[in-house]
């Protein structure tokens, strides 16, 4: 890394030290200021930052920071979901009070465009979202603006999160009829996973590599052949905020596309499809992964101009 990159990592580590000393991660002036500083530090795209190659100390800070961000995000969503459900009219008419609502609108549009391209016009009838939380904005945005006839099943292990989320949509005559909430550990869900055309996996379900891969393996075992798995990942300095999903974490899936936003949408998006027959071991050895090149120029025209599409050429050369 160059001097500027080292300074960036040091700034992130300094912010971690300050955040780790907070008495609470619930929304407050101090919490809001520090997390805004952290996000603004990590958002600028920087391909020179590869968190997987950093020293053990920075790796440990990163893992701790991801956990802290997950807790803070949960508190933030809980806070705003509680406010929204206090409205006498339809709470979904006031979603713009959530400070990151516009990011979810952009992310929802991006993910819908990816689905539209890779499903060749097929509209999913049933979608699962794993790790939906108290403010299930991805499901709400997709159901409201993009998949207007699709049924959404939201899974979360926290009963209080599901109670808030269910109350949030209960006043909407359309969404309330198409959105369902299940309080369960997804590792205990088996047969019903076969009924979904698309499964979304939230960024913070599986906060480290081992946990994430364990969930992916479970989904691969029980999802229907040909079903789509959408995942959130992170790239560059943004990987200090969210876990990274690598193509080779997706054994038994064909990775169709990986998109790295360069605007204020933090998460990268990985879209994959379960193989009808697991044949990964036949390509370059048991630990290799299959990649299908996408029509980048066609897709890029549909995306926000600030989105960056990862090139697959280098990866494909490695596999050949």
From Swiss-Prot:
Q: Tell me the Gene Ontology biological-process terms attached to this UniProt entry.
A: nicotianamine biosynthetic process; phloem transport; pollen development; pollen tube growth
User: Domain of life of the organism in this record?
Assistant: Eukaryota
InterPro entries, per the entry: Nicotian_synth, SAM-dependent_MTases_sf
Per UniProt, the keywords (alphabetical) are: S-adenosyl-L-methionine, Transferase
Q: Does the keyword Transferase apply?
A: yes
| Listed SUPFAM superfamilies | S-adenosyl-L-methionine-dependent methyltransferases (SSF53335)
What reaction does this enzyme carry out catalytically?
3 S-adenosyl-L-methionine = nicotianamine + 3 S-methyl-5'-thioadenosine + 3 H(+)
Q: Known Pfam families for this protein?
A: NAS (PF03059)
Coiled-coil ranges (or none):
none
GO molecular function per UniProt: nicotianamine synthase activity
* Record-listed E.C. numbers: 2.5.1.43
**Stimuli inducing this protein:** Constitutively expressed.
Q: In which tissues is it expressed?
A: In shoots.
Q: What does this protein do?
A: Synthesizes nicotianamine, a polyamine which serves as a sensor for the physiological iron status within the plant, and/or might be involved in the transport of iron.
What protein name applies here? Nicotianamine synthase 3
